[in-house]
């Protein structure tokens, strides 16, 4: 069975000055998940980067229409549909690249 590890997404918090920032530890967790996937030879999809990276949760909350909730932690249905589309495109692209490499190696004498 194939396994895909999907990283944690962005999660923001308000600083004492009222600014929104990516929570400490999110980037380290994503790196840990990516290394774990590599160590176990399973697929990895970086949802944090797919969302737009650091500070992207705030962008999703304030998008019109909104793609995430005002807790700056959870995506909503529209955000889920958007990210699902990005994941689908990534999987299709990966399959196309795999098929091209496979066809290339099958052509060699």
Pin down the residues of each PLM region.
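Conserved, well-ordered alpha-helix/loop/beta-strand core segments that scaffold catalytic motifs
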Residues: 1-11
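Catalytic His-Asp segment of secreted/periplasmic serine-dependent ester chemistry enzymes
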Residues: 10-109
């Amino acid at each position: 069975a194939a396994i895909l590890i999907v990283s944690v997404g962005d999660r923001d918090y308000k600083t004492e000055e009222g600014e929104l920032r990516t929570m400490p530890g999110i980037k380290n967790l994503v790196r840990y998940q990516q290394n774990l996937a590599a160590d176990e030879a399973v697929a990895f999809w970086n949802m944090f980067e797919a969302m737009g990276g650091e500070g992207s949760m705030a962008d999703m909350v304030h998008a019109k229409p909104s793609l995430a909730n005002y807790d700056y932690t959870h995506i909503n249905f529209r955000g889920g549909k958007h990210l699902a589309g990005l994941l689908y495109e990534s999987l299709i692209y990966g399959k196309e690249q795999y098929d091209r490499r496979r066809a290339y190696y099958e052509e060699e004498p």
